[in-house]
């Protein structure tokens, strides 16, 4: 059975709102999770990382004020330390994050979102 699309978002994030609108317009079902209230678990983060092509750099919000304030050197951290940090400070994650059983999309990217829509059975729940 195919895993439903999980959409990690933050309501005041413009990219998240655009992505949500795009998903609804294309009738793609998704399970929305508030990134800061329902932080991804360690296992979910490991799975998300396994779908990246650039590793942690792909999901880390290096331009965020949180990242700048922490003055981190990610290269010196272990994977476990990075995972713990992301669970503790989810504002370090780029958003939105969309993940299903084989595909990951970070940010509002209509071209990448279109790839999701092509592999999903498109139907809207009432």
Curated annotation (Swiss-Prot):
CDD domains: ArsC_Spx (cd03032). It comes from the Bacteria. Disruption phenotype: Deletion of the gene results in differential expression of approximately 70 genes in response to ethanol stress compared with the wild-type strain. Changing residue 55 to R: Loss of activity. Strongly diminishes expression of mgsR and of the MgsR regulon. Keywords: Activator, Cytoplasm, Disulfide bond, Redox-active center, Repressor, Stress response, Transcription, Transcription regulation. The keyword Transit peptide does not apply. Induction: Expression is sigma B-dependent. Induced by ethanol, heat and salt stress. Positively autoregulated. Pfam families: ArsC. One of its GO terms (cellular component) is cytoplasm. Disulfide bonds join 13-16. Changing residue 37 to E: Destabilizes MgsR approximately by half. Strong decrease in activity. It is found in: Cytoplasm. Changing residue 17 to E: Destabilizes MgsR approximately by half. Almost loss of activity. PROSITE patterns: ARSC. The keyword Transcription applies. Activity is controlled at multiple levels. Regulation includes a positive autoregulatory loop on mgsR transcription and a post-translational redox-sensitive activation step by an intramolecular disulfide bond formation in response to ethanol stress. In addition, protein stability is strictly controlled by rapid proteolytic degradation by the ClpXP and ClpCP proteases. The McsB protein-arginine kinase might serve as a proteolytic adapter for the ClpX ATPase in the degradation mechanism of MgsR. Belongs to the ArsC family. Regulates transcription of a subregulon within the general stress response. Exerts positive and negative effects in response to ethanol stress. This is Regulatory protein MgsR. It comes from Bacillus subtilis (strain 168).
